[in-house]
């Protein structure tokens, strides 16, 4: 199943880039745990379920950024876990620039994301991009 999980996650990034939040949310388990570390005006905490992710994460991104890009680079298959290393970039509505790498950790079960964790590479760059 892990190769299928990698394909699922790869497709989710493509859908996110096309602003198709509904398609991304459909890949989440009904009780998904979505973990964001926070900083600046970024989402912070654990969001449970797709509706909480939509309102607490995706809507916050849209409200804060004119440009927001999540560019996956490397996909690492770890069985029921998929780790993605990539790069965030963008410009928030206050003019601050977001520019840092990331590691995203997806735990999968039955083809759905059951847990996600966002780990920006540079906390100060993450906070700076979300401030202003």
Can you name each region flagged by the protein language model?
Residues 9-12, 23-25, 32, 49, ...:
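Hydrophobic pocket/interface hotspot
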Residues 8-18, 41-44, 60-63, 85:
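Short, mixed-charge, low-aromatic patches
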Residues 23, 29-80:
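A solvent-exposed, acidic/Ser-Thr-rich amphipathic alpha-helical stretch
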Residues 4, 58-132:
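A beta-strand edge to alpha-helix "cap/lid" segment located at domain peripheries
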Residues 1-30, 130-132:
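Short, low-complexity N-terminal intrinsically disordered segments enriched in polar/charged residues
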Residues 8-10, 18, 23, 32, ...:
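Low-complexity, compositionally biased segments
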């Amino acid at each position: 199943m892990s190769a299928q999980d990698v394909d699922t996650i790869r497709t989710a990034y493509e859908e996110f880039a096309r602003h198709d939040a509904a398609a991304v949310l459909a890949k989440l388990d009904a009780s998904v745990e979505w973990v964001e570390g926070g900083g600046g005006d970024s989402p912070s905490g654990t969001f449970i379920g797709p509706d909480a992710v939509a309102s607490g994460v995706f809507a916050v991104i849209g409200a804060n950024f004119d440009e927001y890009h999540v560019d996956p680079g490397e996909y690492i298959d770890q069985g029921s876990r998929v780790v993605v290393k990539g790069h965030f970039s963008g410009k928030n509505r206050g003019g601050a620039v977001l520019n840092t790498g990331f590691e995203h950790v997806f735990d999968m079960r039955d083809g759905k994301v059951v847990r996600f964790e966002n780990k920006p590479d540079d906390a100060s760059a993450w906070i700076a991009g979300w401030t202003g």
